[in-house]
């Protein structure tokens, strides 16, 4: 149809002015599943302090097996370390400002205040997971015992390397934690050896496993110049593993350790909301965490088929 042809019916451009568009809520590309936060066991703390008491010297605790005679029984006691480590909750805070004119006029079909808070909370939770891994004070990578740090044999993460981690966290290991590129690199090494890893379904998603332990991806594990790390955790307080810490019963509580409080409206008609997220992490015993260092994710292999 040429531009000079007569119009015989209503056209699309004009018709769309009478139609309603179905609108999504704002999409945020940086949102991740945050598997680490889901898989950790979370412990409520009082007054924001968590003290990890430990036995001083287990080798000094003496017991005896009965010899069916009248020999004297040993006498013993369990001593504790004098200065146990205390973990303090860390806070992730921000203030969300929304102009009242915006929230009054443009909150249909999606509430502007709710969406502003939702997206802000998502960003804060992403930061929370990053801190659980990388924090200088309590992050996993900065709290691994020297004897629990393993180096790769040849750079690329091999089944032998992950076996070394399993040797160090052999008591009820829960999951490996690695950058997605590290998991892909491990998959390539398995394919090269002809031992494709099995898979398991968690939370409706599939994960590859090694020796029955799932490899959980997180883009918060550092990746620099093609090198990264792989972690292995045992989790839970009853297992003397790694536990997440949070403050319960917060004013304006919206979730575990999460608080949203209205701060008022200023003379510029800006409504302010204080959003706070309190959390930390504790490694209860040294053998609850091991790290594979110097993991090279840049190695690829060429396969020849006959």
From Swiss-Prot:
Q: Which Pfam families match?
A: SrpI-like
Q: Name one GO cellular component term.
A: encapsulin nanocompartment
Instruction: List the subcellular locations.
Output: Encapsulin nanocompartment
Q: Where is this site: 5-fold pore central residue?
A: 192, 194, 196, 304
Record's keyword terms, sorted: Encapsulin nanocompartment, Plasmid
The induction text for this entry reads: Transcriptionally induced in the absence of sulfur, requires CysR for transcription. Part of the srpG-srpH-srpI operon. Present in when grown in sulfur-containing media, induced 7-fold after 48 hours of sulfur starvation (at protein level).
Knockout consequence? No growth phenotype of a single sprI or double srpI-cyd deletion mutant in the presence or absence of sulfur.
Where along the sequence does the record put site: May bind cargo?
A: 262, 273
Q: List the disulfide bonds.
A: none
- InterPro entries assigned to the protein according to its UniProt record, in alphabetical order: Encap_f2a, SrpI-like
> How are the domains described in the entry?
Has 4 domains; an N-terminal arm not found in the type 1 subfamily, a discontinuous peripheral domain (P), an elongated loop (E) and the discontinuous axial domain (A).
State the protein's purpose. Shell component of a type 2A encapsulin nanocompartment. Expression in E.coli generates nanocompartments with an average diameter of 25 nm. They can be disassembled by treatment with 6M guanidine hydrochloride and reassembled with cargo. The nanocompartment is probably involved in sulfur metabolism. Probably allows passage of cysteine into its interior; during growth in light the physiological pH is 8-8.4, about 30-54% of free cysteine (charge -1) would be able to pass through the shell.
Q: Which family does this protein fall into?
A: Belongs to the encapsulin family. Family 2A subfamily.
Complex and partners:
The 24.5 nm encapsulin nanocompartment is formed by 60 subunits; monomers form pentamers which assemble to form shells. There are 12 positively charged pores where the pentamers meet with a minimal pore diameter of 3.7 Angstroms as well 3-fold axis channels and dimer channels.
Q: Which NCBIfam families match?
A: encap_f2a
Q: Tell me the protein's name.
A: Type 2A encapsulin shell protein SrpI
Source organism of this protein record: Synechococcus elongatus (strain ATCC 33912 / PCC 7942 / FACHB-805) (Anacystis nidulans R2)
Gene encoding this chain? enc
